Amino acid sequence: MDTCVFPLVVLWISMRITSTLDEVPIGGIFDSRSVQALTAFRHEIHMFNRAYSHVYRYKLKNDTTILDVTDSFAVSNALCHHLSRGDLAIFGVSNASSLATIQSYTDTFNVPFVTISMAQNNSHNGSYQIYMRPMYINALVDVIVHYRWEKVAFYYDSDEGLVRLQQLFQATNKYDKMIISIDTKRITSVENGYHMLKELHLMDPEMEHRVLLDVRTDKAEQIILKVMNDSKINNAKFHFLLGDLGMLEINTTHFKIGGVNITGFQLVDPFNSTSELFISTWSSLDPVYWPGAGTNHVNYEAALAADSVRLFKSAFGSILQKDPNFLRRSRSGTAGKSMKCTDDSEIKTGHGQMILEEMKKVKFEGVTGHVAFNEQGHRKDFTLGVYNVAMTRGTAKIGYWNEREGKLHAHNPRLFQNNSSDMNRTRIVTTIIKEPYVMVNNVIRDGKPLVGNEPVEGFCIDLTKAVAEKVGFDFVIQFVKDGSYGSVLSNGTWDGIVGELIRHEADMAIAPFTITADRSRVIDFTKPFMSLGISIMIKRPQPAGKHFFSFMEPLSSEIWMCIVFAYIGVSVVLFLVSRFSPNEWHLSEAHHSYIANDFSISNSLWFSLGAFMQQGCDISPRSMSGRIVGSVWWFFTLIIISSYTANLAAFLTVERMLTPIDSAEDLARQTEIQYGTIMSGSTKAFFKNSQFQTYQRMWAYMTSAQPSVFVKTHEEGIQRVRQSNGKYAYLTESSTIDYVSNRKPCDTLKVGSNLNSDGFGIGTPVGSDLRDKLNFSVLELRENGDLAKWEKIWFDRGECPQHSSNKEGAQSALTLANVAGIFYILIGGLVVAVLSAAFEFLYKSRMDSRKSRMSFGSALRTKARLSFKGHIDSEQKTTGNGTRRRSHNSVTYTYTGPTNVMGGSHAFEDSNTHTEV
């Protein structure tokens, strides 16, 4: 019953909390064609109310109006509706005609309007508009200047195009040395735009046309497709510059083979972590309930709408932090009264100015990148990606434009030059020195220029020669200038091999070059020619030291102690049960007048020891109890000795090593052993971008460790492992660790399994004419077994003996060090036996001297002669109760024991065994 009541109580409490949350009214005005923007706006509010409303103690209550934004009258009615609701802010779209109406209403009633549409030049400090869409006219001009276009055809389809044209004229005036001629035409439809471009081409078919298409991205795609599919138009004569901010929204696969050159801007960076999360969530939505969602394709207007809600959330949260009673005061004052557009009284919100100012102060990383605003409510400090599509090339990011710097950063100014006559030129292959992939002879190791490819050898060199022969090109090897594989710099550019490919300083990269998602976004890769993974290299630990008592290792010290106690315990129990069992008492064979018991305490110990050593004994138990004790002891010793024997061979002949770590988890849990990666490369990026908790903890350690655990080169990492005396682990590719560990001085070791699964591939610039041919060559080499053959040649050059790991041993011959302890025990036992015999000899001589009333020296000499000769030559006089029998060769002494008779209470005193004499 209690288990049923508790969930109901929790549900009731949560409902009470939800019902007590303050509601913050906001409004939305969206065009009927802005489906994705409206969905993103609604979903962002939904996510806030569900996940964060309990934290901020309020929830957003929105009311959205869908209309034709070009209808100023409908826009006026919508504004009046939202003002009458007391909305604290209004979000939506606008155009050139309706924006003036919106400005008039929002400025009059002091209600902020956050728009995702284009900004206007007539904004001033008193305006209540926030523009999520950045002004990027300077970026357009910088691209035109970068290409040195002196004449541009400007095609537009809306009033916003006229505004942008005006901005374009104003922006080009700053380039005094460069005169840009702009021809303008307004198009009414896709078909109309296609015919205008066809006429433009037919007027001068040999002229190259630079066209700025100021239309929506989807419309521009349709126009260009029509131009491309017209056989009468030479597509190579057109270079289109798109005026929208969604270059990646078009399907560029249609244009790769059409010869059309297209350049455009991208506001949403698809590789930004915030946008990646947004796109992932967007693709998982149900398109029935969330129209336009459920796909990986998100237009930039939807991203702007999502960021607009996040902007308000941040600003309003900041207000509540400063003034927790803001909502209560806003309802009780003039701000709580309904505002009607028909009222003559000028009722203005008392909070509009505060909300507006807070929104201008907000800075955050949104779906559209860095979000910040200036005093006029325009975006600042934003970055636009510049992308290009050209013949034989896919979509490539060729640069970026940053508002703060106000200039274009091009990755390669010559990226779009496509000279077909250069197809058969000698190709430049960039690589990096790393054994056994690429190695150079000492002849040129210190030389700067390379003369030919002969001095270079290795796995990748064999691969290069093979693909060059199959594809049919000449090549020259070039080492990467900065010695790194490639990583993203703070300004968005790449260094290393990746940077050289992006800048077209090399035609391909054949090296131990890992295929990663980040690299694949800016360059192309073939299928992997080698599969591997990140693993851990440590200094090879010394084998476990051999000691004199190695033969005791099959059993732990606890077991040996238990065996000793068991031996003593069994001997004592056997002695006791033999004492109390009548069957163990019998007449002495020497003197039938005496009864004896074979199992004295010394004989019991001797019996137990003989059984444990798997040896026989002259005496055996006669009673049932004694035989039970003996049986269980024999069974015990059988199992113990069998187990010991089974393990003894392995422990004496198998050399074992104890490694301090066995996995990445072991590394992450300790701090004694440092670990790191190469400074620039895929291994470092793997830990940096990993979502796995263990690898995140390892990355946090590596970035904070002092001194730095990162190394500049692969060789430095190996040397650091060798010189750190086991206190540094190097994280690198498994194939490299295997190679180094099998080369002299044989002092490194790979531990644990691979942390991931990677592959090495041939890298090319995006859209390279050799990409597909290289890909086919790699597949053919893999199928023919050539890759496996080269891998065996270059990697299976073992110079080290087979070593054991901590789990598997390498069998070796038995040495004296393994069994030295046995010899020591033997020698020690012999020494103890000799000393014991000497003690007995002296003690017996002393006792005999007292009994025979002779000197100790005489008795000692007599005993010595008896010990050495085995008999006494002269007659010896006996004393005491001993009688002498003389024979020719020996003298036998017979001793008579006590004359006690049976039946008395003292019958058994001092006659427990026949071995007392």
From Swiss-Prot:
Keywords (A to Z) from UniProt: Cell membrane, Glycoprotein, Ion channel, Ion transport, Ligand-gated ion channel, Membrane, Postsynaptic cell membrane, Receptor, Signal, Synapse, Transmembrane, Transmembrane helix, Transport
Chief localization: membrane
Residues in the Extracellular compartment per record: 20-556, 653-818
Sequence segments annotated as region (Disordered): 871-896
Transmembrane segments: 557-577, 632-652, 819-839
Membrane topology, record value: Multi-pass membrane protein
GO cellular component, as recorded: postsynaptic membrane
CDD domains according to UniProt: PBP1_iGluR_AMPA, PBP2_iGluR_AMPA
Cytoplasmic membrane side: 578-631, 840-917
Localization per record: Cell membrane; Postsynaptic cell membrane
Example of a GO MF term: signaling receptor activity
Residues bearing glycans: 62, 95, 121, 125, 229, 251, 261, 272, 418-419, 424, 491, 775
Signal peptide segment: 1-19
Reported function: Receptor for glutamate. L-glutamate acts as an excitatory neurotransmitter at many synapses in the central nervous system. The postsynaptic actions of Glu are mediated by a variety of receptors.
Family: Belongs to the glutamate-gated ion channel (TC 1.A.10.1) family.
Protein name (Swiss-Prot/TrEMBL): Glutamate receptor
Organism ancestry: Eukaryota, Metazoa, Spiralia, Lophotrochozoa, Mollusca
